[in-house]
Amino acid sequence: RIVQNGILLAAPFLDLSARGSTAGEGGLLSVALHPEFAVNRWLFVHFTNTAGDILVERYAASIVDPNIAQTAGTPIVAIPHPTFNNHNGGRVAFGPDGMLYLSTGDGGGAGDPDRNAQNLGSLLGKILRLDVAVPPYMIPASNPFVSQAGRRAEIWAYGLRNSWRFAFDPPGASLFIADVGQGQREEINAVPTSASGLNFGWPVTEGTICFPASAACDRTGLQPPILDYDHAQGCSITGGYVYRGAAMPELAGRFFYSDFCGGWLRSLRHMSGTATERVNWNLPTFGAVVSFGEDVFGELYVLASNGRVARIVRN
């Protein structure tokens, strides 16, 4: 949908309801505007189809009406997701390098039963990095597993359960990844945007603890989170953005996040691999937070499962 000059337009820009599935955790998961959207009017859409597979397709605005997408989309990525209807991933977004990044869940089920997240031959439980200048996509030569037998060259990072949102912070040269835990810990990872081939640990670890918690584990080569919290505080992390707006300059550089069950709003700063200056904001009764948004001015928005959208402002 498009909100234009404060008014919600009657006709949706794009309707995928006939092709998509909302079973389990499926549905329309995220969208990303091409960096040259003002010129090419390309929108990349991340959703699950009726078979439960993870798709990314490119749509363009109609020549007749720029507020409505052309009917036919261009296929970009199709990832089979046949076993479970949860852990479909996360987000599609363009990085500062102009590449398209896609986070995928581990394929679902408790404890990653198919062992996808640590399998470099699978695209599940990963962050993928793609060059979409020519459809469907090309593999960037700088991806970490290019030309390595048995390893998918699309992979940028791995060892993720279901990263519910990731966000780039170009001024800080950082990538923030919020990964939903199994039954013990929720985690936030923050790494340099240039860091590739990182293993975030799942299902060897869940946050900062071994998985399962009763077992010993080898953490060699694993990238630890900058922050994790237990399920006394929530059950499913929702990652946001680093604030870079002008309305509240004192918040510049803070990463905002929430939790679907906790209902709170928190922020932190990232410094040398550590979460600092953590703040729990006084969020009015709002609903289960499912996502965040960021406008062209760097101001942030919070979205709830009850359909509410609110902008974060100074009280």
Indicate residue ranges for each PLM-predicted region.
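Mobile, glycine-enriched helix-loop/loop "lid" segments at the mouths of ligand-binding/catalytic clefts
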Residues: 192-220
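Acidic/polar, solvent-exposed loop segments in beta-strand-rich repeat domains
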Residues: 110-122, 138
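Blade-edge beta-strand/turn elements of extracellular beta-propeller
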Residues: 2-22, 59-83, 122-162, 215-233, ...
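Repeated scaffold domains used in trafficking and secretory/extracellular systems
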Residues: 287-291
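Acidic, Gly/Ser/Thr-rich repeat motifs that build Ca2+-stabilized beta-propeller blades
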Residues: 1-111, 165-185, 198, 233-271, ...
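Acidic/polar loop patches that form or flank catalytic/metal-binding clefts of enzymes
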Residues: 136-141, 175-178, 197-204
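Extracytoplasmic, non-cytosolic globular domains
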Residues: 117-130, 154-187, 191-192
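Conserved strand-loop elements at the edges of beta-sheets that form or border functional pockets
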Residues: 94, 158, 294
